[in-house]
Amino acid sequence: MAKERVILHCDMNCFYASCEMAYHPELHGKPIAVCGDPERRSGIVLTASYPAKRMGVKTGMPLWEAQQHCRDIIFVPAHYDLYTRFSSYTREIFLRYTDQVEPFGLDEAWLDCTASQSLFGTGERIAREISDTIKDELGITCSVGVSWNKTLAKLGSDYKKPDAITVINRQNFEKIVFPLPASDLLYVGKKTASKLDGYAIHTIGALAKSRPEFLQQKLGKVGLLLWRFANGLDNAPVAKYEQREVLAPIKSIGNSWTTPRDLLTDQDVWIVIYLLAESVAARLRENHFRCRGVEVSLRDSSLFSFERQTHLSQPTMQEKEIATAAFTLYKKHYHWNEHLRSIGVRAVDLQPDTEPCQISFDYSAEKQEEMEHLEAAIDGVRNRFGYYSVQRAIMYTDKLLSRCDAKNDHTIHPHGYLQGSI
C-alpha cells in the first residue's frame, strides 16, 4: 500500500506589504497599501496590510477609493526587486526540507514532504518549523495548509490567516471543506461560481455531492475536474524545484511570468508580452537559432490556462516579430472572462541561424539583418551595464509590470491542470 502523501501549501501573508514592513519597521502595525505609483490617483492597490484590510481596503481597489475607506492609509510604491529577493529567501528555506518545491508566483509554493517525515517529523511539525523560520529569519509571516494533495493544501492555507497552520486530513476533511463557498476551490473563478450559483451549488459540499455527469454536461471538462477536487481527488505531483532536462537538445526557448498584479487591459498584456519576447529573442541569438513559430500561454485569475501557436512566414530572432505574433494570438483567443495572472511566450520550431532563409518579395533581407544587428548591440549594452540600461518607451508607462528581467530571472512557472480555451 502506497504511503499517503504529505503536501504543504505555503502562502506569504500580504506579501508585498509584509516585505515593505520588514524593510521599514516604522510601518509595522500601520494601514499601508502597496501600489504601482502613489502619485497617480488612478492607480490601484496591489496589496494592503491587515490594518488597512480591516478598514475595507482591498486588492485592485483604486487609490482614491482606498483613501475613502481609510483616511490614514499610507501608500507605498512597489519595489519588485525587494519582493523577488524575499521570494528567493523563502524558497531557500523550503529547500532545507524537500527538493520538491513548486513555486506559484512570488508568494506561494507547494512542497511535497512525504519523504521528509523520517528526518523532520509530521507534516504539521514541518509546517510549524517553516513558519517559525520564515518569521525569525525574514520578519514576515505565512499561512500553511497541510493535506494529502495540492488542492486541499491550498484550501488549508486560505482557511486561516494570518500566521496560521491548518491540517486537512481524512477525518476532518468534510467538516472543514464542505461548508466552504464553492468559489474557494481551485479553478472556480467568478464566471464558474456564477454558473454554479445558478444550479443552486453554493458550497464545496454541494459540488461534491452533485452528479459528475451533470457537471460535465453544464461546465465541460472543468466540471468533472471540480467534482474530483471537491471530493478530495487530486493526484497532481509537486514538481522538483528548477527541474531541467539535462543535455537534451533545445527544441524551444521560452519564458513565462506570474505578474505582480492582475493584467486588466490590452496595454498591460502588450507590456508583459514584449518584455518576455525580448528575453526569448536574446536567448535565440545566444544559442544561434531562429524560430519558425511562436506559442503564447495564458493563465487567468481562476488559474485556468491554455496555449496557442502560430506559424511565421519567415524564421526570426527579432523581439518585435515574436511579440507581435504572441499578441495577435492573445487578441484572437482571449475574451476577458477573468483578469490575466500569468503569460508565457515561447519560440518553437527552431532552426540554426546558419540555415539560409527564403526571402519573400515583401520581406527585406537587408532590413532583417539591420534589425538583428541592432538588437544584438542592445544585448551587448545590457550585458555590460545591466538589463535596465536600455528599455522601450512603453515600459515607462507601468514601472511595476516592466520591473522584470525575464532573461536573467528565467522563471518558468507551472502550467495549470487544464488545457483548453477560455
List the model feature ranges, each with a label.
Residues 109-115, 307-310, 352, 357-363:
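Short, hydrophobic beta-strand segments
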Residues 104-108, 147-150, 289-293, 338-342:
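Short Gly/Ser/Thr- and Asp/Glu-enriched loop/turn motifs at secondary-structure junctions
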Residues 321, 327-384:
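C-terminal hydrophobic structural anchor segments
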Residues 28-30, 71, 140, 290-294, ...:
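A generic structural signal for short beta-strands and their flanking turns/coil linkers
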Residues 1-228, 238, 282, 365-422:
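Gly/Gly-Pro- and Ser/Thr-rich, intrinsically disordered tail segments characteristic of DNA damage-repair
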Residues 15, 38-41, 301-305, 350-354:
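Short, charged/polar surface micro-motifs in flexible loops or helix N-caps
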